[in-house]
Amino acid sequence: MRYLTSGESHGPQLTVIVEGVPANLEIKVEDINKEMFKRQGGYGRGRRMQIEKDTVEIVSGVRNGYTLGSPITMVVTNDDFTHWRKIMGAAPISDEERENMKRTITKPRPGHADLVGGMKYNHRDLRNVLERSSARETAARVAVGALCKVLLEQLDIEIYSRVVEIGGIKDKDFYDSETFKANLDRNDVRVIDDGIAQAMRDKIDEAKNDGDSIGGVVQVVVENMPVGVGSYVHYDRKLDGRIAQGVVSINAFKGVSFGEGFKAAEKPGSEIQDEILYNTELGYYRGSNHLGGLEGGMSNGMPIIVNGVMKPIPTLYKPLNSVDINTKEDFKATIERSDSCAVPAASIVCEHVVAFEIAKALLEEFQSNHIEQLQQQIADRRQLNVEF
């Protein structure tokens, strides 16, 4: 399975084409739109979320509610394009018109793609960079992930997410599965402890009042994964490596870990390796899950636990020093409308990116021309965990 997105932040629409989805999978557009709505929420979001009400239109690959096995095309309209039609349209405009609209950007923002992207593609107007490098593109990726979540649900695989940390304010590292699932989306910062939620809101407000931004840590959990998905044979087929690449490809994500992650460096091996147990009902399982459900680049049947680190958003209302690329003079960087904290929304994006990587790995592991074939093969693999 693979996908390709297109579109700019203030262009007319985002488009995504997904190839490799099995035939006969029931798809309801409202299920995808429900996930799109989640991405737009969260404390600390900017004013654009009041303008955009993201919904998906499926224009190919689905007929009468079921996938055909052919490429699926989805479109997300940018409602804000009405205010940008001339400056972001495909039709040529004069230099005078461009200057009068005052949308040309020559002062790159530190921490953004502006300057390096301008160098790479020889853009003297850095808007040509920031329009595509914007996190607006993640709306299309969430649409893909939502499609994948429908697929995973049909395979009895659950995936969900939460916020672990914002600006140094931390929730617990781990919760049991039932507590986790029972408290999803209980508040607007997506943490389970309400007291910690208020402390996070206060931290976000403090950053906003200072014209600053803050980052954090999110966690994604995948449950009921069949064993042996991925590979120990080749580096590029290791499941944890593929998930890691997907996570750090999300805008502003700078780190990823699994299970106890970097804390494993602080402990002896006897406290980190997960002992192997067996009973006739479950088959093989682990007495703990310090490694986050992954051994040797493969799923081991335990919940896969993914932690992603998001840096503070680089667009600041008290901008840092930069240099005008035309005059080479020092200036404060350009200010674009932005969030003060997007960590709650980023947890949704991360969840859907992981959903795609999991679905892709499953479709490579098992024959998957149609959903019934895939369901049977995964059932056989689950039985192998008992019979081996």
Swiss-Prot record:
Cofactor(s) needed for function: FMNH2
Reaction(s) this enzyme catalyzes, per UniProt: 5-O-(1-carboxyvinyl)-3-phosphoshikimate = chorismate + phosphate
Gene Ontology cellular-component annotations: cytosol
Enzyme class (EC, first level): lyase
Pathway: Metabolic intermediate biosynthesis; chorismate biosynthesis; chorismate from D-erythrose 4-phosphate and phosphoenolpyruvate: step 7/7
Pfam families found in the cross-reference section: Chorismate_synt
Keyword Nucleus belongs to the record: no
Keyword set includes tRNA-binding: no
Residues the record lists as binding FMN: R132, S133, S134, N251, A252, G296, K311, P312, I313, P314, T315, R337
Keywords: Amino-acid biosynthesis, Aromatic amino acid biosynthesis, FAD, Flavoprotein, FMN, Lyase, NADP
Protein function: This reaction introduces a second double bond into the aromatic ring system.
HAMAP family: Chorismate_synth
Subunit structure: Homotetramer.
Protein name as it appears in the record: Chorismate synthase
Organism, scientific name: Staphylococcus aureus (strain MRSA252)
Organism lineage string: Bacteria, Bacillati, Bacillota, Bacilli, Bacillales
Gene: aroC
